[in-house]
Amino acid sequence: MTQGIAFFDFDDTLARGDSILPFLLYCIRKRISPRRQLVKAAGAFLYWKLRPSRASRAKSATLSFLKGRSADEMLDVARAFFRDEYLPRFYQDGLTELWSLRSQGMKLVVVSASPDVYMRALPEFMPIDAVLSTRCEVGGDGRYTGQVGE
């Protein structure tokens, strides 16, 4: 029997730091994203700092390398990112709390502004039931369109 729902943020709550830059750097190292994407991301970040209301444009620029990539392929990349790179950033206290709440019958939901391209793999690495995150659009062909948060 469900005893309620608990909501958690991801970046700086369940894991140390912001996750989008480590994901981009992982994709560059694995040759999924070109190195020039880092320059594009830096420019997008500066633009976002100057105009915070344009966060979706900054994310679109940062993640534009996804355009045309298969959602299934990127799910495999997301799994590898968490497994190979990001698990050490998970806060042990946060994981302990998740397990405690789960044992009490709570449903656990992570709500994050981070993109779903990698956040959708998170339930495989944490005891959570769902993730609500920034949507990266996938077309009818199962490939990313390059649109983020639209």
Model-derived features: positions:
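Glycine-/proline-rich flexible loop or hinge segments
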Residues: G43-A44, S56-S60, V77-F82
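Short coil/turn segments at secondary-structure boundaries
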Residues: Q37-A41, R57, Q92
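C-terminal cap/substrate-recognition subdomain and adjoining C-terminal extension
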Residues: M1-Q3, D76, R83-E150
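Acidic catalytic patch
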Residues: K67-V77
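Active-site neighborhood of HAD-like aspartate-dependent phosphohydrolases
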Residues: M1-L50
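Hydrophobic alpha-helical segments typical of transmembrane helices
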Residues: A61-T62, E73, Y118
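Helix-loop "lid/cap" segments that line or gate small-molecule binding pockets
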Residues: F45-L50, R57-K67
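Acidic/polar active-site rim loop that often engages polyanionic ligands
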Residues: I20, A58-K59, D141-G146
